[in-house]
């Protein structure tokens, strides 16, 4: 298990847990590990980008200094999205890419995530190799001198190459569709107008004026309520909300209903399936996807494959089994036909393309997914794994599952960061879901609760 790396890179409160000193060390260690097998006849190249957080420039300078100190050529992208970095690695044939962002988290946080030469997030073994260098008693990495030091080059045309890529993933423009777009005051803020104007949409924007502190602040994919108002007030056909680094997308239909990642996956999957383009007729989901999605998938002749929470697990399953569509309820949608990581703007464009090609409203496309009421109970416990071998807890779960008789779901899972056990139930009615969740939670509390 990694010490510094979480499910999405290294993350913490900027200037405290994620300090400039740490960024420098990550630049040296990460840069060395990711370029040590590069062609010795040419200087290794690494792309660096950031989102709009106030701490971004501070960490960027330190990170780049670390990279330069091990002889790496840095292409600086400035403010751009995480999926843009992953895409441009391949365009530039770079050894790696690094994004400075804490995604959907508040401005006080920041993070550093690495991508390999293939544009994918790093495997655990590579992260562990970087951590071993960070924890070594002394720094034994190379310290080149003179012409051996790295250099920095600005790469402003990267944004244009990325937006052109997005625009060419659909066969036609999106003229005739009216859309409201929420940029979360993040990385997509400077790209939205260019893309949606080029695609000839009638668009309005909100949360596209970052000031370093307002990223994700009551806006974006984790706070779509403002976008709902914007859609209804403007009479838009739909709304799209991205997160701070642009790898998530949540939509809003013309009636003001929130269309989460589950519904987006269904809409895209159903469209691809009908066109014979959904590989193995399978959508890859995580354990947090609603039972309503699974019922809709099955009712429409498709299948699902399930992974643990985290888009990296979805990507691993897709790569291993040859699937081309997957994602999370939170709005990370991966469409392997075009990209190898979650991309909010790509997802939004594909969703609008389905609307244009079918002539259907977003509410109509999402209607087959009837989301079941869900209740989540977090319980502080003495031992997060004790529930697995506790007979009374297992019996309580079995009893509820038998009562559900296939018309509901129980998911019990430990928190990855806190001494909590999460009990999640889904059922056909609010009354039933409350009853079932409370029933199991009461037994957990009495058996292993603190």
Swiss-Prot record:
One of its GO terms (biological process) is peptidoglycan biosynthetic process. It is an enzyme of class 5 (isomerase). GO terms for molecular function: magnesium ion binding; phosphoglucosamine mutase activity; phosphomannomutase activity. Its EC number is 5.4.2.10. Keywords: Isomerase, Magnesium, Metal-binding, Phosphoprotein. Its cofactor is Mg(2+). The modification Phosphoserine is found at residue 103. It holds the Pfam family PGM_PMM_IV. Mg(2+) binds at residues 103, 243, 245, 247. Signal peptide: none annotated. The active site is at 103 (phosphoserine intermediate). PROSITE patterns: PGM_PMM (PS00710). InterPro entries: A-D-PHexomutase_a/b/a-I, A-D-PHexomutase_a/b/a-I/II/III, A-D-PHexomutase_a/b/a-II, A-D-PHexomutase_a/b/a-III, A-D-PHexomutase_C, A-D-PHexomutase_C_sf, A-D-PHexomutase_CS, Alpha-D-phosphohexomutase_SF. Activated by phosphorylation. Gene3D superfamilies: Alpha-D-Glucose-1,6-Bisphosphate, subunit A, domain 3, Alpha-D-phosphohexomutase, C-terminal domain. The keyword Isomerase applies. It comes from the Bacteria. It catalyses: alpha-D-glucosamine 1-phosphate = D-glucosamine 6-phosphate. The keyword Hydrolase does not apply. Binds 1 Mg(2+) ion per subunit. One of its GO terms (cellular component) is cytosol. Belongs to the phosphohexose mutase family. Catalyzes the conversion of glucosamine-6-phosphate to glucosamine-1-phosphate. NCBIfam families: glmM, PRK10887.1. This is Phosphoglucosamine mutase. The gene is glmM.
């Amino acid at each position: 298990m990694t010490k510094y790396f979480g499910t999405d890179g290294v993350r913490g409160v900027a200037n405290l847990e994620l300090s400039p000193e740490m960024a420098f060390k990550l630049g040296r260690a990460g840069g060395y590990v990711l370029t040590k097998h590069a062609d010795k006849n040419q200087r290794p190249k690494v792309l660096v980008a950031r989102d709009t957080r106030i701490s971004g420039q501070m960490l960027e300078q330190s990170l780049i200094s670390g990279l330069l100190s091990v002889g790496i050529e840095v292409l600086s992208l400035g403010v751009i999205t995480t999926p843009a970095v992953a895409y441009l690695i391949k365009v530039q044939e770079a050894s790696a890419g690094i994004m400075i962002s804490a995604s959907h988290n508040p401005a006080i946080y920041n993070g550093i995530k690495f991508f390999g030469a293939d544009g994918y997030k790093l495997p655990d073994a590579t992260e562990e190799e970087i951590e071993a260098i960070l924890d070594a008693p002394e720094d034994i990495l190379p310290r080149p001198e003179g012409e051996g030091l790295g250099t920095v080059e600005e790469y402003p045309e990267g944004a244009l190459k990325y937006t052109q890529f997005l625009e060419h993933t659909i066969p036609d423009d999106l003229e005739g569709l009216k859309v409201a777009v929420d940029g979360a005051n993040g990385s997509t803020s400077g790209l939205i107008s260019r893309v949606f104007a080029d695609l000839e949409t009638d668009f309005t924007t909100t949360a596209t004026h970052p000031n370093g502190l307002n990223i994700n602040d009551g806006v974006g994919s984790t706070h779509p309520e403002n976008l709902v108002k914007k859609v209804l007030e403007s009479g838009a056909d739909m709304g799209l909300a991205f997160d701070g680094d642009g790898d998530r997308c949540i939509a809003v239909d013309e009636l003001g209903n929130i269309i989460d990642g589950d519904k987006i996956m269904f809409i895209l999957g159903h469209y691809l399936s009908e066109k014979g383009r959904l590989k193995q007729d399978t959508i890859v989901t995580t354990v947090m996807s609603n039972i309503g999605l699974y019922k809709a998938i099955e009712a429409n002749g498709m299948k699902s494959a399930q992974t643990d929470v985290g888009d990296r697990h979805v990507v691993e399953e897709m790569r291993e089994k040859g699937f081309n569509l997957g994602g999370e309820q939170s709005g990370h949608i991966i469409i392997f036909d075009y990209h190898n990581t979650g991309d909010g703007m790509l997802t939004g464009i594909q969703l609008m393309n389905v609307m244009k090609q079918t002539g259907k409203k977003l509410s109509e496309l999402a209607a087959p997914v009837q989301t079941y009421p869900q209740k989540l109970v977090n319980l502080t416990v003495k031992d997060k794994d004790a529930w697995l071998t506790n007979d009374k807890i297992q019996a309580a779960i079995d009893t509820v599952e038998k009562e559900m008789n296939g018309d509901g779901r129980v998911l019990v899972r430990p928190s990855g960061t806190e001494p909590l056990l999460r009990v999640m139930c889904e059922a056909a009615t609010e009354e039933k879901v409350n009853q079932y969740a409370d029933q199991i939670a009461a037994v957990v509390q009495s058996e292993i609760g603190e």
